[in-house]
Amino acid sequence: VLAHVSHLLEIANARVWRGKTLALPDFSLVISRGESVAILGPNGAGKSTFLKLLTGEVRPEACPETHCRLFGEALWSLEEIRHRIGVVMPEEVSRFAPEEIAVDAVLSSLRGAYGRTRNMRFSPEDRSRAAAAMALLGVDGLAARAFGTLSSGERRRILIARALVHRPEVLVLDEPSTALDFAATLTLTQTLQQLLSAGTDLVLVTHHPGEIPPAIQRVILLRDGRILADGLKSKVLSSAVLSDLYQVPLRVSWSQQWCQVRPA
């Protein structure tokens, strides 16, 4: 059983390969439990590889000086992780048939499935958990709707409810605003801020600094599989640092702890 310890993730001197490419060379990072973090970087920075490391889908190269621990454990099962880390990936949307009912999309997460609940049995407690997760995301009114009739933003919030139905210790979001329009992105960022205020720990992976909610104070910048900067949002998200990260001149301004980035 995974231990109850102070760190969510401890990585030291990890080398992670994706095929023949060294995606994370000599990578070290600690994320504490109770801490919310944003991982920021351009395409190809190593964000998706880091995410797979965090969720146990990939392992680092075996070396004496390397260690990788989740919740203090070097060995774990994906089943254990699934109950302690809720993961939301944009591509999950395509796993559901258009006729799938929204509440069934959420319930099926409890069985590690994507809908198709006809032969599944759910207890009143299961249904209560699904209803609570949907209410928290503001999509309880959509419970009886077919997945194919929902907007992109509504589908994304259903996916987050799926992740939260397990009552995980941390929620991991990969590029949550992908394919969303401006209004849906705004609603989503407000939803994330509400989740953080309610005590949900969040690891947000994005390439948009403007999506980082005020409640997230630690930001880690990745480029070419290496950590370019790691620290307080107010210091890391500067015009100079982001211009270096994205290799274009950028100007950063702030509005009520939301970061705004424009061409310089």
Regions found by a protein language model. Give the residues of each.
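Conserved ABC ATPase signature
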Residues: 120-121, 146-150
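Conserved catalytic motifs of ABC-family nucleotide-binding domains
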Residues: 167
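ABC ATPase nucleotide-binding domains
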Residues: 243-264
